[in-house]
């Protein structure tokens, strides 16, 4: 969405919306334009590629949801973070900040503008029933949107494990593969006590008794 007039000063320079498009014009991503429509900062969006109709917030939102995958979820998170006082930008080519495939929104550090510094948060927007590959989660902040449009933010990181053990399990230990686990019938005590392997069956038996 291209906005003219004094858009660069009013929206980009002062509030971090969009990216410069030459002169005073800026380009807005769909979530940015929808948020400005919702706030009343834009009165309408004109569809020059279609019927040239002036689209209200509702009409633009419905059209964007049909045109862009997961637009509604991304808009909910974008609007929520804006309402919390964050500057942020879509993670897409040409917009401030580094665009990466595994995140949807980029939040710069407080007191800076998008693209000025390394992002403080990389936001991946997901629905609460979506499955996520564990190896793609490190160093992302998940914005999980539930079926009632409530949003939970979950930070992820790559942990560092300190310490170790000098225990080496004895050779020749055998077990039975039962379903998705192995039962070692005659495991030595140090197998669990010092090697921290598995769970002793007698603990479960004591609980049952």
What spans do the regions from the language model cover?
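Conserved phosphate-interacting/catalytic interface
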Residues: 1-79, 83-209
């Amino acid at each position: 969405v291209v906005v003219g007039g004094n858009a660069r000063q009013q929206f980009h320079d002062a509030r971090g919306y969009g990216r410069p498009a030459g002169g005073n014009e800026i380009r807005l991503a769909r979530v940015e334009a929808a948020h400005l429509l919702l706030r009343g900062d834009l009165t309408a969006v004109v569809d020059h590629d279609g019927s040239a109709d002036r689209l209200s917030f509702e009409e633009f939102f419905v059209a964007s949801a049909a045109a862009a995958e997961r637009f509604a979820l991304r808009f909910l998170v974008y609007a929520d973070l804006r309402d919390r006082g964050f500057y942020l930008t879509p993670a897409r080519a040409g917009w401030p900040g580094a665009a990466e495939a595994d995140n949807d929104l980029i939040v710069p550090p407080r007191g800076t503008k998008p693209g000025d510094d390394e992002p403080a948060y990389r936001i991946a927007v997901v629905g609460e029933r979506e499955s996520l590959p564990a190896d793609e989660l490190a160093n992302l902040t998940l914005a999980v949107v539930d079926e009632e449009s409530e949003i939970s933010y979950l930070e992820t990181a790559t942990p560092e494990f300190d310490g170790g053990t000098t225990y080496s399990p004895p050779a020749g230990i055998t077990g039975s593969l039962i379903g998705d686990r192995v039962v070692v019938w005659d495991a030595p005590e140090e197998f669990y006590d010092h090697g921290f392997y598995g769970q002793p069956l007698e603990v479960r038996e004591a609980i049952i008794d």
